[in-house]
């Protein structure tokens, strides 16, 4: 299984070698698969990840991104810098993990769609996005590495016969590689799906009836009220009114995207409103460092 995304965090339990998989076959194109995850930033120069019989390789194809944008703290490796690739790869082919703990709450068993698959990660995206020239190189390498399935959970174009990424997927199809691509985050109106190529499996979101819902009640200084339905994955809720502050208007912080850690105590006893953008998990973690009781993620275009 080849995941083309923002990289993975290789120490994640979803990619641990549990001893239940044989060594993978040699790449179809000969040679050996690249394994470049670099040092673990938590223990630099001490813990260098070595590929094994679950996560069998990792390569980065971000040369254009790094030269054009250059904001990736894990540049030059296949290590994930924003969590998206770790999420998509584990959803597709992550191990069975019996106790998935989120903020101290045991959420039970999780697993990917194909927990018995070998995983190869191809990093093509940085914090600011992805570029077709990097993606096409990764697709061609995945073909040479002998992957059976490519997952590409990233938006794309709607012109399959001229889009370079879609044409790279056509090469994969010709090499008997199944490509699964996301339909994107637009919609649900007509003509809002991405990856319309007839040679890909394009996957859209679906719904189910399991929900844990709560209401968010906002009261302005003039007494106006507004209630929105929200969701929470934490075990303990907020059971009393708290002030809501805008991250970008808070003295001593002024980061609308909440991408920098807040000073201790800055948001004590408050709910912080952060603008949507890269890495919503990191946003929550950063405001939590400042003592925030909760976070609201808002879309500035609505």
Explain the meaning of each model-derived region.
Residues 205-259:
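A short, polar/acidic, helix/strand-boundary loop motif
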Residues 179-181, 204, 294-298:
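Short hydrophobic alpha-helical runs that function as membrane-insertion/retention elements
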Residues 186-190, 281:
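Active-site environment of divalent metal-dependent phosphoester hydrolases
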Residues 126-130, 152-154, 159, 237-302:
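Extracellular/luminal Protease-associated
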Residues 150, 182-183:
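Conserved P-loop NTPase motor core
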Residues 1-131, 145-148, 160, 174-176, ...:
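Subtilisin-like serine protease catalytic core
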Residues 168-179, 193, 300-302:
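Short acidic, glycine/proline-enriched helix-loop-strand junctions
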């Amino acid at each position: 299984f080849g995941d083309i995304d923002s990289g993975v965090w290789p120490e994640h339990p979803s990619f641990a070698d549990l001893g239940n998989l044989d060594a993978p076959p040699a790449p179809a194109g000969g040679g050996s698969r690249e394994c470049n995850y670099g040092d673990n930033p938590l223990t630099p120069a001490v813990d260098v990840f070595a590929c094994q019989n679950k996560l069998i390789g990792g390569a980065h194809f971000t040369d254009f991104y790094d030269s054009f944008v250059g904001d990736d703290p894990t540049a030059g490796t296949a290590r994930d810098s924003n969590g998206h690739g770790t999420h998509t790869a584990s959803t597709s082919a992550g191990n069975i993990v019996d106790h998935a703990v989120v903020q101290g709450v045991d959420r039970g068993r999780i697993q990917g769609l194909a927990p018995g698959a070998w995983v190869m990660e191809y990093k093509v995206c940085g914090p600011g996005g992805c570029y077709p020239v990097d993606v096409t190189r990764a697709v061609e390498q995945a073909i040479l590495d002998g992957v059976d399935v490519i997952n590409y959970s990233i938006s794309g174009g709607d012109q399959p016969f001229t889009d370079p990424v879609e044409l790279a997927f056509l090469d994969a199809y010709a090499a008997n590689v199944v490509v699964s691509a996301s339909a994107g985050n637009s919609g649900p109106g007509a003509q809002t799906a991405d990856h319309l190529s007839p040679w890909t499996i394009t996957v859209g979101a679906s719904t189910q009836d399991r929900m844990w819902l709560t209401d968010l009640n906002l009261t302005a200084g003039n007494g106006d009220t507004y209630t929105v339905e929200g969701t929470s994955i934490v075990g303990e809720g907020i059971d009393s009114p708290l002030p809501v502050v805008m991250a970008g208007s808070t003295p001593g912080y002024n980061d609308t995207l909440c991408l920098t850690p807040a000073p201790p105590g800055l948001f004590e006893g408050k709910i912080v409103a952060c603008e949507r953008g890269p890495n919503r998990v990191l946003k929550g973690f950063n405001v939590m460092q400042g003592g925030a009781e909760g976070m609201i993620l808002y879309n500035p275009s609505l």
